[in-house]
Amino acid sequence: MAISFLCFCLITLASLIFFAKKIKHLKWNLPPSPPKFPVIGNLHQIGELPHRSLQHLAERYGPVMLLHFGFVPVTVVSSREAAEEVLRTHDLDCCSRPKLVGTRLLSRNFKDVCFTPYGNEWKARRKFALRELFCLKKVQSFRHIREEECNFLVKQLSESAVNRSPVDLSKSLFWLTASIFFRVALGQNFHESNFIDKEKIEELVFEAETALASFTCSDFFPVAGLGWLVDWFSGQHKRLNDVFYKLDALFQHVIDDHLNPGRSKEHEDIIDSMLDAIHKEGKDSSLELIIDHIKGFLANIFLAGIDTGALTMIWAMTELVKNPKLIKKVQGEIREQLGSNKARITEEDIDKVPYLKMVIKETFRLHPAAPLILPRETMAHIKVQGYDIPPKRRILVNVSAIGRDPKLWTNPEEFDPERFMDSSVDYRGQHYELLPFGSGRRICPGMPMGIAAVELGLLNLLYFFDWKLPDGMTHKDIDTEEAGTLTIVKKVPLQLVPVRVQ
């Protein structure tokens, strides 16, 4: 009898708590939401280019809106003011990450920096990354690698220039950023290693991004294993695991090479730095690293550091070639400032060309490589633009929509670097109308490394070469159609004819 009475009391108490929460939630002022279907929510309203679909929905429902992806509520932010509230005002309360199937797997159960939810372990790893891997001193120590790889690209393009044959600049720039990554992070020379196949690496980057971007039911239908079952039948689990094993084999190979006592060590790379940290374990009790952490960090750099830099350069060259006056102006400044006799560009030359920096800013605005900041998750109740955002709510910031907001930018669809002529707006996370690297505690830690590669790569392309279109093409034929989800590529690869400038 006593047990029955106790059970009755517990059930009654649980019911009261449940309904109290329900009543409290009814009083909340939630963001506006488009009509949704049962079960799937608003998933049917998301097209092949999610950032564009979300932009169009925001134009109708406002810069802060609530969508339902399956059973998961997601708040989408599409204005500078709302982004500032999320990324600065409430940064601490919404700087966690949702635990997704793909990110859990590729980060080796959240042993990385990008995908790990907020907590003491993440704070210690982030501190280590900023102090040891991506600090200014470390970025500068890899300067010779960036300069050598850009010089190698110039030599390759010069050979094509002799024959006046078109080059796939999209592929050339991907290999440039990939070769820099492999030397900086893995200590492997793209051009000398017998282990690394360039074509397979490009394929692996594509597979990894596709697997992460593909619809994973488990993330949106976490009920009674329903999502897991659908993912198993659809092959999504297999795709993610295939990518995981390929990346693991690659990373394990280079880590084993670094652990070889007979290995020659000309320059310290990122794996060396992390292995040193493991050997010194105990001096910093807040940080405990194992080999899985190295692989988690490498996965972050592999996914975020190769494709994004190449895409920024591709979009910049696309817009410049499409606008002959602009490319003439930026090349005129570069060649006037650097002179006509340089055999090799160095990173000291970058500060001499402010117009090129404006071109890069405008590319970040109009063509951010990652149009949606990686999803955040609230850890407490917050208010954004007067709307209530409950705890455990995913938040997406649409930086592409903000970059094309006519309230912020004159003629936002036009590529106009001179809009930054007398502007203090920068891309380092302090100006919320331009957020290619995010902002706040979750800003991309590899930003200095990525910027250095983009600036030097474009400087080489524009100093040493003039660029012509393949026979039969005019500037009007250059399209800017997009493709992709996590990162946005030019749908039709950029084919140009390099003409070496003597």
From Swiss-Prot:
Taxonomic placement: Eukaryota, Viridiplantae, Streptophyta, Embryophyta, Tracheophyta
Membrane topology: Single-pass membrane protein
Transmembrane segments: 1-21
UniProt key word Zinc: no
Record GO cellular component, one term: membrane
Gene3D superfamilies in UniProt: Cytochrome P450
Pfam families recorded: p450
SUPFAM superfamilies (alphabetical): Cytochrome P450 (SSF48264)
UniProtKB keywords: Heme, Iron, Membrane, Metal-binding, Monooxygenase, Oxidoreductase, Transmembrane, Transmembrane helix
Residues annotated as binding heme: 444
Name of the protein: Cytochrome P450 71B20
Gene Ontology MF terms in the entry: heme binding; iron ion binding; monooxygenase activity; oxidoreductase activity, acting on paired donors, with incorporation or reduction of molecular oxygen
Co-factor(s): heme
Family to which the UniProt record says this protein belongs: Belongs to the cytochrome P450 family.
PROSITE patterns per record: CYTOCHROME_P450 (PS00086)
Source species of the chain: Arabidopsis thaliana (Mouse-ear cress)
